[in-house]
Amino acid sequence: MRIGVIGINHKLADLKLRDALAKACQKRFGANQSVHDQHHFILLSTCNRTEVYFSSHDLTATHSYLLSILRQDVKEDFDHKLYSFFGMDCFSHLTRVTSGLDSAIVAETEIQGQVKNAYNLATTFLCLPKELHFLFQKSMGIAKRIRSELHLGRGLPNLEHAILQTGKYFFRNTQQPKILFVGASEINRKILHFLKSKQYSDMTICNRSEIRSKELAILYGLHLLPWCQLDSWHQYDWIIFGTKSSEYLIKPEKNFIPADNDKLIMDLCVPRNVEPKLGQNAKITLLNIDQINRLLKIRHRGMTQALIEAENRVNLATYEHTNRYRQKEDSKITIFAASA
C-alpha cells in the first residue's frame, strides 16, 4: 500500500512546537488547501496530535516534500520530534489512534469523531486515491469493533470528570460560577452536557455560528454571547475554550482584566485559543490541555489488561486486512497480464 503519515503528538513535543506545526499544517494541508500535484493528503489535527496522512507513487519524495513545506513555516528545529510510518505500519498507527490507544487520555471517545470528520472533510474537497479511502475506512471499522468488544474506557474518569473536579476545587467557595463556553465543538458540548447534569445552571455559549449557538441555548437552557462580544469574556468566572482558531482569541494587551474576582480559564485547543502570557496575571489561572490530561493518568492503570488485548487485536486486524488488500491487487495484475 502506498500510504504514509508524518506527525507530532503530546508525547514528543511541548505545546509551543505543536502550536506552530498545527498552524502550518492547517495552512498548507487543510482539505481546501491540499492541491499538491501528485501528492494526496488528509490532515488530522486535534488537541493532542497533528498528523498528515499521504499517498503517492513515490512516498519518499512526498515525505521530503512535506518536510520542505513545513520548514518554510516553522522556524524552530522540529525534525527530531516527528514520527513517520509507511505501509502497514501507517495502517496500524491510524487504527491505534482511532481506537484511543495512542491518546493522552487513553481510550477517549472524541478521537473517533475527529478521525471521521477529517476523512469526511477531505472527501468533500478532494478526489482521493483508493489507498487513503482504504486506510481510513478500515481503521475506523476496526477501531469501532475493538472499542465495542472490549468496552474500552467505560466506567473510568474522563476529560469531563477532570474538568469538573478542577472547577469544583477552584470554585469551592462559589455556589454557582458564571461559566462561558467558547466554541460549540464536540468536546465543549460533552463538557456542557456533563456540567448541566451536575446542576451547573449559569452557563453561556459563544460561537461563530449564531444558528448553532441558539440550538444549544434552547437544548440546555443557556445564555447567548454573540461572537463579536467575546472581548467581554472577563465578565465570567470560568471560561472554557474549545474552538479552532489560527490566532489567539484573547491576549493580555487586548482585553481588560478586572481585579474583583479570580478567573479559571481552560484552553482545550491546539493551536491554543488563549495567549499563554495571560496566565501571568495574578487573578487568572490558565490551564492548557496537557495540564488537564495529567489529572487522568489513573485511567491507564485501570485498563492495563484491556489495552494489551486491544493492541494485539489492532496488530492482527491490520495484518489481515493488509494481506487481503495485497492479494486483491495482485489478482488484478494477473488478470490484466493474462488479457494483454
From Swiss-Prot:
<dbReference type="GO" id="GO:0050661">
    <property type="term" value="F:NADP binding"/>
</dbReference>
<dbReference type="GO" id="GO:0008883">
    <property type="term" value="F:glutamyl-tRNA reductase activity"/>
</dbReference>
<feature type="binding site">
    <location>
        <position position="114"/>
    </location>
    <ligand>
        <name>substrate</name>
    </ligand>
</feature>
<protein>
    <recommendedName>
        <fullName>Glutamyl-tRNA reductase</fullName>
        <ecNumber>1.2.1.70</ecNumber>
    </recommendedName>
</protein>
<feature type="binding site">
    <location>
        <position position="103"/>
    </location>
    <ligand>
        <name>substrate</name>
    </ligand>
</feature>
<dbReference type="InterPro" id="IPR015895">
    <property type="entry name" value="4pyrrol_synth_GluRdtase_N"/>
</dbReference>
<dbReference type="GO" id="GO:0019353">
    <property type="term" value="P:protoporphyrinogen IX biosynthetic process from glutamate"/>
</dbReference>
<comment type="function">
    <text>Catalyzes the NADPH-dependent reduction of glutamyl-tRNA(Glu) to glutamate 1-semialdehyde (GSA).</text>
</comment>
<dbReference type="InterPro" id="IPR006151">
    <property type="entry name" value="Shikm_DH/Glu-tRNA_Rdtase"/>
</dbReference>
<feature type="binding site">
    <location>
        <begin position="46"/>
        <end position="49"/>
    </location>
    <ligand>
        <name>substrate</name>
    </ligand>
</feature>
<comment type="pathway">
    <text>Porphyrin-containing compound metabolism; protoporphyrin-IX biosynthesis; 5-aminolevulinate from L-glutamyl-tRNA(Glu): step 1/2.</text>
</comment>
<dbReference type="InterPro" id="IPR036291">
    <property type="entry name" value="NAD(P)-bd_dom_sf"/>
</dbReference>
<comment type="similarity">
    <text>Belongs to the glutamyl-tRNA reductase family.</text>
</comment>
<dbReference type="InterPro" id="IPR036343">
    <property type="entry name" value="GluRdtase_N_sf"/>
</dbReference>
<keyword id="KW-0627">Porphyrin biosynthesis</keyword>
<dbReference type="InterPro" id="IPR018214">
    <property type="entry name" value="GluRdtase_CS"/>
</dbReference>
<comment type="subunit">
    <text>Homodimer.</text>
</comment>
<feature type="binding site">
    <location>
        <begin position="108"/>
        <end position="110"/>
    </location>
    <ligand>
        <name>substrate</name>
    </ligand>
</feature>
<keyword id="KW-0560">Oxidoreductase</keyword>
<feature type="binding site">
    <location>
        <begin position="183"/>
        <end position="188"/>
    </location>
    <ligand>
        <name>NADP(+)</name>
    </ligand>
</feature>
<feature type="active site" description="Nucleophile">
    <location>
        <position position="47"/>
    </location>
</feature>
<feature type="site" description="Important for activity">
    <location>
        <position position="93"/>
    </location>
</feature>
<keyword id="KW-0521">NADP</keyword>
<dbReference type="Pfam" id="PF05201">
    <property type="entry name" value="GlutR_N"/>
</dbReference>
<dbReference type="InterPro" id="IPR000343">
    <property type="entry name" value="4pyrrol_synth_GluRdtase"/>
</dbReference>
<dbReference type="Pfam" id="PF01488">
    <property type="entry name" value="Shikimate_DH"/>
</dbReference>
